Amino acid sequence: MDATLALPLLIALIAIALFFDFLNGLHDAANSIATIVSTRVLRPQYAVMWAAFFNFIAFLFFGLHVAETLGKGIIDPTIVTPLVIFSALIGAIVWNIATWIFGIPSSSSHALIGGLVGAGLARTGGDAIVWTGLLKTVGAIFMSPMIGFFLALLLILIVSWLFVRQTPFAVDRTFRVMQFISASLYSLGHGGNDAQKTMGIIAVLLFSQGYLGSEFYVPFWVVITCQAAIALGTLFGGWRIVHTMGSKITKLNPMQGFCAETGGAITLFAATWLGIPVSTTHTITGAIIGVGAAKRVSAVRWGLAGNIVIAWFVTMPAAAAISALTYLAVDLFL
């Protein structure tokens, strides 16, 4: 398709992609602030502003490896058309809105990946999929919550041993301050990993239309607009999912909140540097369960945690189905 002729559609699709990025911040804001809110270190309105700031500046600390994975590591960029991107975004957005309405902390990341896969399959079948990249990402579905779980569990055991001689009041006071650091780190990881997914979508769209020349890369203006969109979404993040993530799964004190956020942040930092588009929802949920289980196994509301896990597994196929149906329906009229 000629790049000039596609310009109005291109602008509209970029706007839809940025809307998804905004929804990502809105939907996943809870991941960054759930623990600091549930421990009452910050009120929700101040916590979202804190998280939004660190979401925005995340591009200063990470490369663009995740954007490259989304742009050319899930589906073959040579088969990408505006309709493929449109369908992928619709699949992800519809699923995100549905889970946000019901307060279900599903993964925006895997909704987007599912949307891409569904649209790619609808266009050219299995040949559209970069199976090595997809399998690596699906593997991260299982690994990220487990890593978050074990890191948070290890941290809570180490910290509990180090502060065993301190009074509960002194420990609480110390970790109320430390949670500002851990929440900042987690918000950096959230902004660094999640915003890059939309960067990859916009960049591959530009590449498919000939705006990037012969080599795939992410323009700086795409980086800035995506970071701004996710930060703005975080600023308007909803309390429904904050409440689920921060208090319904397990009750947290400041020390536990610090360990959960730090374990989650380490996982996100490593994944972002490796170019793996993991789920911030999976990561922080695993970490929260880890600190709850360290207290006692019964401290975790396993029934609710199980419902969340089911939502994780449903997300990719559900978004893929919505995306594929969108592609086939629109294609009938083109």
List PLM regions with ranges.
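Multi-pass alpha-helical transmembrane bundle typical of ion/small-solute transporters
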Residues: 1-334
